[in-house]
Swiss-Prot record:
It comes from Mycoplasma pneumoniae (strain ATCC 29342 / M129 / Subtype 1) (Mycoplasmoides pneumoniae). An essential GTPase which binds GTP, GDP and possibly (p)ppGpp with moderate affinity, with high nucleotide exchange rates and a fairly low GTP hydrolysis rate. Plays a role in control of the cell cycle, stress response, ribosome biogenesis and in those bacteria that undergo differentiation, in morphogenesis control. Mg(2+) binds at S173, T193. PROSITE patterns: G_OBG, GTP1_OBG, OBG, OCT. Residues 355-433 form the OCT domain. This is GTPase Obg. InterPro entries: G_OBG, GTP-bd, GTP-bd_Obg/CgtA, GTP-bd_prot_GTP1/OBG_C_sf, GTP1-OBG_CS, GTP1_OBG_dom, GTP1_OBG_dom_sf, OBG_GTPase. Residues 1-159 form the Obg domain. It is found in: Cytoplasm. Keywords: Cytoplasm, GTP-binding, Hydrolase, Magnesium, Metal-binding, Nucleotide-binding. GTP binds at residues 166-173, 191-195, 212-215, 282-285, 310-312.
Length: 433
């Protein structure tokens, strides 16, 4: 199974079942009466974070997934069966985005965190539900509501406290392998690491998750190479280690290397360059006379930025680890005990808009070149879908709903007259009075 950390899919909740018209025929109910049951509710689409799940591979080739629809009502007052929920398990760290609005719907940061992505439709009423002292034998029933449907992207952004960033071949993989029990592929050529590698680093009875972010290249923020693919994994990190190689084979100028990486981070998101960051010079064992380190240290000192030096190969890492954990403690004091800080856009709340019986949106009336009146109204659409025009009682009920919306009065104000044609929901109607 390959590692898949991005996919797009449409999810649809189940439709509500339809109510029915039926009449009681039991021996002990000689007067009969309405007996049509209600439709069952449609199943929801539920996403749930699971720490045992580490990939979106199972969704990679799925274009459209459906929850079960509710069953139709039955005779003898029997209701339809509710549809089963469709429960999709996703890795912790998955972000869900609505592709139509580009809005983040959910960010899973805890194991077993769940979210109803699409709500199932409510079941329609059968004629038994309309029985009253005034209407003892109603020929009324309803269709079930449609389930919600969304086209979304699912994207894993790895949950790490510390992200190690830099150009390819700066020693990031070597560093994380010496700090933790991670086993990245290490070789002396560019682009050895193609996916982020996570490792747990312990210090004084504390532990942090470090991530080796694959090497960035120039214009990574614009998608060059696998730029966007790599940069998005940095968004959750609270601390960044900016690793710069002192080996002249890797960079002509370490100062220029620093600026290029900072430029790519800034172009991708200003939030990245505002993160707490340690700039670290690696491969000091190659810089024998120390001139390249001194040049970089002086350059950063002029900017008020301290520079740490290490040799990951020789495991000279004690001071760096202590500095990272000290910085982490300052972060905890500032933000509290939350390990992972969500993007600011997650403060917004997602609200799904669909037609309902309580909608009071404005009525839109326009006249075409043929003199027909085109009417648009979300609430009216709801009732046209809800009430089948198959019985006289249903047609009268739909007529009452149209009057409640006030369509007749607004058509008169717009200039409509007797005999004019009204177009709504793909149907044509003639004004009779």
């Amino acid at each position: 199974m390959g590692l898949t950390d991005y996919c797009e899919c449409r999810f649809s909740a189940g439709n509500g079942g339809n109510g029915i018209i039926a009449w009681r025929r039991e021996a002990h109910y000689d007067k009969g009466g309405p007996g049509g049951g209600n439709g069952g509710n449609g199943g929801n689409v539920v996403l749930q974070a699971d720490h045992n799940c580490d990939s979106l591979f199972f969704l990679k080739n799925k274009k459209h997934l459906f929850a079960e629809s509710g069953g139709n009502g039955k005779p003898d007052l029997a209701h339809g069966k509710n549809g089963e929920d469709l429960v999709i398990k996703v890795p912790v760290g998955t972000t869900v985005r609505d592709l139509d609005t580009n809005q983040i719907l959910m960010d899973f940061v805890h194991d077993q965190q769940s979210f109803i992505l699409c709500y199932g439709g409510k079941g329609g009423k059968g004629n038994a539900a309309f029985k009253s002292p005034i209407m003892r034998a109603p020929n009324l029933y309803e269709n079930g509501d449609k389930g919600q449907s969304l086209h979304v992207s699912l994207e894993i952004k790895y949950l790490a406290n510390v992200g190690i960033v830099g150009f390819p071949n700066t020693g990031k993989s070597t560093l994380i392998s010496k700090l933790s029990n991670a086993k990245p592929k290490i070789a002396n050529y560019r682009f050895t690491t193609l996916v982020p590698v996570l490792g747990v680093v312990k210090h004084n009875d504390q532990s942090l998750v470090f991530a080796d972010i694959p090497g960035l290249i120039e214009n990574a923020s614009e998608g060059s190479g696998l730029g966007h693919y790599f940069l998005r994994h940095i968004e959750r990190c609270e601390i960044l280690i900016h690793l710069i190689s002192l080996d002249p084979v890797d960079h002509d100028d370490p100062c220029q290397a620093y600026e290029q990486i900072m430029r790519e981070l800034s172009k991708y998101s200003q939030l990245l360059v505002k993160k707490k960051m340690l700039v670290v010079a690696n491969k000091t064992d190659v810089d024998l006379d120390g001139t390249r380190f001194q040049k970089l240290a002086q350059y950063l000192e002029n900017k008020g930025i301290p520079l740490f030096k290490i040799s990951a190969l020789k495991q000279e890492l004690g001071d760096l680890v202590a500095q990272v954990f000290a910085l982490h403690q300052k972060t905890l004091a500032q933000f509290g005990a939350n390990k992972f800080h969500l993007p600011m856009e997650m403060e917004k709340h997602y609200v799904f808009e669909q037609a309902s019986e309580t909608d009071h949106d404005p009525l839109n009336i326009e006249r075409d070149a043929l003199g027909r009146w085109h009417v648009e109204c979300k609430r009216l659409h709801y009732w046209f879908d809800k009430i089948p025009q198959t019985t006289l009682d249903n047609i009268r009920r739909l007529g009452n709903k149209i009057k409640e919306v006030g369509i007749e009065d607004q058509l008169k104000v717009a200039g409509a007259k007797k005999g004019d044609v009204i177009v709504f929901a793909g149907q044509e109607f003639v004004i009779n009075d």
